[in-house]
Amino acid sequence: MNDAVKLERRATRRQRQAEATQAEIVAAATRLFFERGYMATTVEAIAAEAGVALQTIYNAIGSKRAVLSRVLDFAAAGPDAPAPVPVFMARRTAEIHDAAGFARLLADWFAEVAPRVAPVFRVIREAAAVDPEAAELDRQRAAQRLRNYAEGVAAMQRRGIAAGKATDELAAAIWSIGYPETYRMLVIEQGWSAERYRSWVEASLSAVFLAARPEEVRHPE
């Protein structure tokens, strides 16, 4: 075995160890954030729960706010994620050929991801009410989701789907309909079934994608 192969294997081993350590930290932080809330959870407590040194958290992820952001990333991606969310969603979007299919894809995705991320968003929103750093994280992640939706819409429009409609307005519609708080209010608070929620998301997005713009509506003379 030559030196290059040995170095590559060592690098791969170190990367896997780093990923495993991050996963342990995120799992520990998730448990504590859910049990105690963000404000009552210290980085020291996360380190103790994860069984790692305090400095390991700062080296592997960063501040407590960064840990909370990573908790959201892990929740969104789900277990054994094949790729970051924007990457595998772009792959799924590439297989869609019409507005109905786009609405169905998003409805399937929101129904899949909402149960995982809604509890994390509750932690973020509660923390944002009293902590400036958590509030900034909330704003940043909201803006990031809106940008991701706009990129997805633009990609579909380049293929002639929902073309002629305002990209930012369609992205805003996806953002609001698929917002985790909407899931929480309908499913957790109002008792909707998961299938009813998914069907509502699909119908709502289909109506948005297929609706005519105001200047396209013809009034009878």
PLM features: residue spans?
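Short helix-capping/turn signature of helix-turn-helix
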Residues: 38, 126-131, 177
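Hydrophobic alpha-helical connector segments
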Residues: 64-66, 70, 80-115, 171
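N-terminal intrinsically disordered/low-complexity leader segments
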Residues: 1-20, 213-221
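Ligand-binding pocket scaffold of soluble enzyme catalytic domains
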Residues: 44-45, 56, 60, 64, ...
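Amphipathic alpha-helical packing segments from all-alpha helical-bundle domains
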Residues: 108-125, 132-159, 168-172, 199, ...
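Helix-turn-helix
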Residues: 24, 28-66, 70
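Hydrophobic/aromatic-rich alpha-helical bundle segments in the mid-to-C-terminal region
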Residues: 156-204, 212-221
